[in-house]
Regions:
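Core beta-strand elements of the Rossmann-like FAD/NAD(P) dinucleotide-binding domain
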Residues: 193-204
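C-terminal catalytic lobe of FAD-dependent flavoproteins
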Residues: 134-143, 151, 288, 292-420
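Central beta-strand plus flanking loop segment that forms part of the substrate or channel wall
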Residues: 25-27, 224-252
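Flavin (FAD/FMN) cofactor-binding and adjacent substrate-gating region
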Residues: 70-79, 84-158, 162-163, 167-169, ...
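Glycine-rich FAD pyrophosphate-binding loop
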Residues: 1-16
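Flavin (primarily FAD) binding-site architecture
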Residues: 207-223
């Protein structure tokens, strides 16, 4: 049984316009490769995220080959991933990043250039009419992707609806969740259209509700949820659909976040293909909000404050006042202010060609640390009950791009004995051929699985 609060699936954070649609692989996202105090570049997180995205590509390839997913271009399209920086310091950083990453087999196809001729070919919209005295540099990986996660998810659910043992309950928020003495879970859901109350009982519950996962996790009452809170962040994009502009840019170009800005604010100018229609997107422009979902309540944040997480949340609030001020400042930006930021990437941008569009909500994890204080996390995390009967996925980026790997982790944690059986091992390797092996360490295996996914998903 799949229970959905809205009257259709994948229309919150998963929907096409509610996220950047980047197939997060660490190719262009500079915040995944932080600079150390001694000037070196740390690449561990980029390697991890790249390997996790390869898991998603393998699963999607299998589903396409089996006819479960439709033509790949309906949900994923080849879109080069590029990083672009300006100024002596950032150019030096990007070159060090390139040297570190390209030496590893996961990133062996990365290119680097400071050549005006190359840049004119790679990103004409960005270099046209740029100050010729400004030092700039870029990296590129051609087999990056733009993903319409909304289309992907709806295609998966459409197939599930054809299966005999699947039921989809729409317009049905969960009002009650509690574990019985026998370890099974009782849930009550109420249909918002008919008022009908349905009682469910199950041996396993997964909470994959984006920003709505934290309140449901708190309702479950599991001990492992104690100390967790959420810091909601809204988002906005500048969007352009004018064909004469859109056709000049065919890539995702990520820059560096401004000094003092949080990792979530890394600016990027993206090609998007949603419902088959190309457009350009620039952002994100973050904002302060108290909602956990785009279609949530202004009381979501205050409603999530419990005695078990009050101290961590107060600790984070106190230690992140700069972040709060930054987010509030973002809210009060004018259209001209936002277009001025865009001109750092696209010097010829005109205000009248771009419209503001709301993105989805992100709920960053607040996690209790030793001593009872709190820490703000910028990734994703699985929280699971000790007995393996309930699990939830919390957090934001890299989000949907690594969802397949996250669900494998859920299976391993919640079904530890079954996953060891030959039947389950065989099935996992059928879905994800690299299962049980490290793509970070095994170059030959990476070469094999990447050749298959690039071909099947038409990304090569």
């Amino acid at each position: 049984v799949m229970v959905e609060r809205l009257d259709h699936v994948a229309h919150e954070s998963t929907d096409g316009w509610n996220n950047a649609g980047t197939g997060h692989a660490g190719y262009c996202e500079l915040n995944y490769t932080p600079e150390t105090d001694d000037g070196d570049v740390t690449i561990d997180r980029a390697l991890q995220i790249n390997a996790q995205f390869e898991v998603s590509l393998q699963l999607w390839s299998y589903l396409v080959e089996q006819g479960i997913l439709p033509e790949p271009s309906t949900f994923i399209n080849r879109t080069p991933h590029q990083s672009f920086v300006w100024g002596e310091k950032d150019v030096a950083f990007l070159k060090r990043r390139y040297e570190r990453l390209s030496a590893h087999h996961l990133f062996r196809d990365m290119e680097y250039t400071e050549s005006p001729k190359d840049l004119e070919e790679w990103m004409p919209l960005i270099v046209n009419n740029r100050d010729p005295m400004q030092r700039v540099a870029a990296t590129r990986i051609k087999h990056g992707s733009d993903v319409d996660f909304g289309s992907l998810t709806r295609s998966m659910v459409s197939w599930l609806e054809t299966q005999p043992n699947f039921e989809l309950m729409l317009s049905s928020p969960v009002h009650y969740i509690d574990q019985r003495d026998n370890g099974r879970w009782k849930l009550r859901v109420k249909n918002q259209k008919t008022g009908e109350l349905t009682k469910l009982e199950t041996g396993f519950v997964f909470l994959g509700a984006g920003g709505g996962a934290l309140p449901l996790l708190q309702k479950s009452g599991i001990e492992e949820a104690r100390g967790y809170g959420g810091f909601p962040v809204s988002g906005q994009w500048l969007v352009c659909g004018k064909p004469d502009i859109v056709q000049q840019h065919d890539s995702k170009v990520y820059g560096k976040a401004p000094i003092g800005a949080p990792p979530m604010s890394v600016p990027h100018l993206d090609t998007r293909i949603i419902n088959g229609e190309p457009a350009l997107l620039f952002g994100p422009f973050a904002g302060f909000t108290t909602r956990f979902l785009k279609q949530g309540s202004i009381f979501d944040l205050i409603g999530s404050v419990k005695s078990t997480n009050l101290k961590p949340m107060l600790s984070v609030s106190k230690s992140n006042m700069d972040l709060t001020r930054y987010l509030i400042g973002e809210v009060f930006q004018s259209h001209s202010d936002r277009v001025a930021s865009l001109r750092n990437f696209f010097p010829d941008a005109m205000e009248e060609d771009w419209q503001l569009r709301m993105a989805g909500q992100r709920v960053q994890i607040i996690k209790q640390v030793d001593g009872g204080g709190g820490k703000l996390e910028f990734g994703t995390e699985i929280v699971a009950a000790k007995d393996g009967t309930l699990a939830a996925l919390l957090g934001a980026s890299p989000g949907a791009s690594t969802a397949a790997n996250a669900m494998i982790n859920v299976i391993e944690r919640c079904f530890p004995e079954k996953i060891k059986t030959p039947e389950w091992q065989e099935r996992m390797k059928e879905l994800v051929p690299s299962y049980g092996h490290s793509l970070v360490e095994d170059e030959a295996l990476l070469t094999e699985v990447r050749a298959r996914t690039l071909s099947t998903l038409k990304l090569g």
